[in-house]
């Protein structure tokens, strides 16, 4: 929910595998065949249940986070995390905003280490992209020719969780080189 601990707790308690699969199945039946979310077994299992029920593939857009500095837990190193994304059945792998935005180097107009991560994503047969709250990420990725097939860019008219003005974010999204 990103709005309160209580709402987050309620959603996690109420939305079990069966309920999530039921919602996914409704969307699959209506022709919506992609879902975006974090790297969790629950999302992958619910997607498989919905696929079995409807007979169509659900494309998973996974937004993992992993160590970007040395010294983190070994299971959170990029390789093992990306392996889990592939095992879960991800079609697309868009590193999460919590990491991407920290790697944006405005001075040198680059997203540090992203080329390495994109290569690792492609090596696992997934399609790379970026999940970001920072519109500069989109501009810098486009300018630098980063291996990005698409973006998840936060946008809402109220400006909730947006670091810049809504109209500026809208222009960046409209001018992005990739959808």
Question: What is the role of each PLM region?
Answer:
Residues 66-72, 101-179:
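Beta/alpha (TIM)-barrel catalytic core signal, keyed to glycine-rich beta->alpha loops juxtaposed to Asp/Glu
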Residues 1, 33-36, 57-61, 91-94, ...:
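Structural preference for beta-strand elements that scaffold enzyme active sites
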Residues 51-71:
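Long, hydrophobic, well-ordered secondary-structure blocks that form the structural core
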Residues 85-106:
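Active-site groove signature of glycoside hydrolases
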Residues 16-19, 42, 68-81:
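Glycine-rich anion/phosphate-binding loops
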Residues 34-44, 132-137:
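Gly/Ser/Thr-rich loops at beta-strand to alpha-helix junctions
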Residues 1-34:
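N-terminal binding-site loop/beta-alpha segment at the start of enzyme catalytic domains
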Residues 25-29, 44-57, 79-90, 142-145, ...:
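Acidic (Asp/Glu)-rich catalytic clusters
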């Amino acid at each position: 929910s990103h709005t309160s601990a209580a709402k987050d707790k309620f959603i996690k308690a109420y939305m079990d595998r069966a309920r999530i699969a039921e919602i996914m199945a409704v969307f699959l039946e209506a022709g919506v065949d992609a879902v975006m979310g974090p790297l969790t077994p629950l999302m992958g299992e619910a997607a498989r249940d919905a696929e079995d029920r409807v007979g169509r593939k659900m494309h998973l857009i996974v937004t993992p986070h992993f160590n970007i500095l040395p010294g983190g837990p070994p299971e959170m190193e990029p390789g093992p995390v990306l392996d889990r994304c592939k095992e879960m059945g991800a079609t697309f792998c868009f590193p999460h905003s919590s990491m991407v935005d920290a790697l944006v180097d405005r001075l040198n107009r680059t997203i540090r280490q992203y080329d390495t991560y994109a290569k690792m994503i492609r090596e696992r047969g997934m399609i790379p992209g970026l999940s970001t709250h920072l519109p500069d990420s989109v501009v810098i990725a486009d300018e630098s020719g980063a291996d990005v097939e698409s973006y998840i860019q936060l946008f809402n008219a109220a400006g909730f969780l947006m670091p810049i003005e809504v109209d500026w974010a809208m222009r960046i999204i409209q001018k992005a080189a990739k959808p």
